[in-house]
Design a protein with these regions (language model features):
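Structural motif
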Residues: 8-9, 67, 132-133
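Active-site substrate-recognition segment that forms the wall
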Residues: 53, 62-63, 72-183
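Flavin (FAD/FMN) cofactor-binding and adjacent substrate-gating region
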Residues: 1-40, 45-52, 57, 169-170, ...
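Core beta-strand elements of the Rossmann-like FAD/NAD(P) dinucleotide-binding domain
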Residues: 58-67
Length: 183
């Protein structure tokens, strides 16, 4: 079902797909089983060095830790600045997606990525573990680190670009659209 305009491909037999939500939950469960204390809904307000590591302050209290991993995504620069002089600033990139109905799932059997551009990793058409297709993302710099809304222009770009790879996609079989931010 690939476009006849496709001239070459890179076959990566080790590539795979996962359910990203279940994968993230499994990683959190594994971390807890190995002694990690999750402090959910606890924004970090200060970080200080201590003889044993670090003290992380939140509205819910202070937490002592030997190690602190800054996994704050697009807010990682703000968390970094709580401990060190600001050294960088993150401008998030919004990526918009289509989640297609299972009726479109047979269009591709592998992850189809286009070549990346200067602005992003490229638009993909990929099967999901549930038999659907996921299509996207675009890459649009946004100033607001909470802006995960979709736009008509962004989704039109994703649709047009994906059709260059898989021209038989029926975007009327779209279940939902969503967006995320990348650092």
């Amino acid at each position: 079902n690939l476009s006849e305009a496709v001239q070459a491909a890179l076959y990566a037999p080790s590539a795979g797909i996962v359910d990203p939500w279940r994968f993230a939950l499994a990683m959190a469960e594994t971390a807890v089983e190995n002694g990690v204390q999750l402090c959910l809904q606890s924004p970090v307000t200060a970080i200080g060095k201590t003889p044993g590591g670090f003290c992380v302050q939140t509205p819910r209290g202070a937490y002592e830790a030997r190690y602190v991993f800054n996994a704050a995504g697009v807010q990682a620069d703000e968390v970094h600045a709580l401990l060190e002089a600001p050294g960088y600033a993150i401008t998030p990139s919004r990526g918009e997606y289509y989640l297609m109905d299972k009726s479109q799932g047979a269009q591709v059997g592998r992850i189809i990525f286009q070549c990346p551009s200067q602005s992003g990793k490229g638009v993909l058409v990929a099967p999901t573990v549930h038999g659907n297709l996921i299509v996207g993302p675009n890459a649009e710099p946004v100033p607001d680190k909470r802006d995960v809304g979709t736009t008509g222009a962004g989704l039109a770009y994703v649709r047009k670009t994906a059709l260059r790879s898989v021209p038989g996609l029926n975007f009327r079989e779209n279940i939902r659209n969503f967006a995320g931010l990348r650092a």
